[in-house]
Amino acid sequence: MSFSVDVLANIAIELQRGIGHQDRFQRLITTLRQVLECDASALLRYDSRQFIPLAIDGLAKDVLGRRFALEGHPRLEAIARAGDVVRFPADSELPDPYDGLIPGQESLKVHACVGLPLFAGQNLIGALTLDGMQPDQFDVFSDEELRLIAALAAGALSNALLIEQLESQNMLPGDAAPFEAVKQTQMIGLSPGMTQLKKEIEIVAASDLNVLISGETGTGKELVAKAIHEASPRAVNPLVYLNCAALPESVAESELFGHVKGAFTGAISNRSGKFEMADNGTLFLDEIGELSLALQAKLLRVLQYGDIQRVGDDRSLRVDVRVLAATNRDLREEVLAGRFRADLFHRLSVFPLSVPPLRERGDDVILLAGYFCEQCRLRLGLSRVVLSAGARNLLQHYNFPGNVRELEHAIHRAVVLARATRSGDEVILEAQHFAFPEVTLPPPEVAAVPVVKQNLREATEAFQRETIRQALAQNHHNWAACARMLETDVANLHRLAKRLGLKD
């Protein structure tokens, strides 16, 4: 089999049709999977010795949340080192990173695997992976044909990274040095709420504004603060953390502003406070709503005038600090109740950000679960940790009052329990491994079965034919979208459609 010009042109056209990078990446992967008739395909971005999934087709949804460190995945490390097409033999002893992650075939091992490293010049920027369940599935394609595919994918990814970099630099004030955009490695999630939050982070990071980050406990406010700092011109300087809720009143002022020798009992030497440590960098004040009114007044002065006084010292020190504050309280209500200063609130909330709770993030829960599964796999030295369909269904319908932190702990506990119930280094998480309160799952939909005067095979084919027709009509005859709607493999759908007479 060889690629025609029409096939390559179709791939290029699909890339141009996409609206935004994510849509283009998904169109690329879906089209490639259809053309190559493989069981699974993925586009990965390379960053800091790990591969980060950008788009997948034919793989479990939680793969998008996983981070594949090279030291834990020898096949991916081989792809990163190769510099050219890598074909893994069916009997390769190197474990496939997607074993157990192809829906409907969790118990089967991937047989055929091809890796295509993607380069921008001499720099590795990503990889394409193609997987199939048949050992000789990709033998019909020459290395030269696969290199053409890799070149198209590398061009799309390289352009996306360049645009991302240029957009970031355009938001810089004046002649500030270029900086990196918000790293997708940290901010996991594709829900509308998280997409909007990432955009807002990218916007405010380029400025020097104070930011108030609000959100329920466990939503990841500290992660947002890190993302802002790392995407800002101050990223070369320290990000200093202080949990205001853990500060005893007797030492709070010293922690913030420092003290001089002899300022109080136990002050045996001069000591810098958090503001001095964060000079020219960023200070993250977590749980800002827990500060006393007296300390709030002193904090306000620093924000207004940019100088501090160590405890026991009459001299003022100039500091250049950007303040990021976080709270799980409604500070407007705290102001009305007299527990928080209105002037400080307005100083801090120049650019407010709200982190959505996990229950409002849709399928992000599955992506995050995949991320934590991969963390557990590496930490415990397991060959794989995968979620069963029942576990995924449970996670999607649980309310998670403790948000992402609760999910993380639940995954870690479930892995330990599942590992104890089976031998070997492979763990499959089932619903019973999660100790959630009773969760009401929606009843399965049962379709009405019409009375037909056909044998079983004819009735089955008639049902399949009509189902595919309806799905195609609803998806404007887009086969990839139709396959996603029917939750089946697009290559298998094409083969079935041909057998049913729906395609030539």
From Swiss-Prot:
Task: Tell me which InterPro entries the record gives.
Answer: AAA+_ATPase, GAF, GAF-like_dom_sf, Homeodomain-like_sf, NorR, P-loop_NTPase, Sigma_54_int, Sigma_54_int_dom_ATP-bd_1
Top-level taxonomic group: Bacteria
* SUPFAM superfamilies, alphabetized: GAF domain-like, Homeodomain-like, P-loop containing nucleoside triphosphate hydrolases
Its function, per the record, reads: Required for the expression of anaerobic nitric oxide (NO) reductase, acts as a transcriptional activator for at least the norVW operon. Activation also requires sigma-54.
Q: Which residues bind DNA?
A: 479-498
- UniProt name for this protein: Anaerobic nitric oxide reductase transcription regulator NorR
Give the gene that encodes this protein: norR
Which UniProt keywords are listed?
Answer: ATP-binding, DNA-binding, Nucleotide-binding, Phosphoprotein, Transcription, Transcription regulation
Q: Which Pfam families match?
A: GAF, Sigma54_activat
- Which NCBIfam families has this protein been placed in? PRK05022.1 (NF003451)
* Residues carrying 4-aspartylphosphate: D57
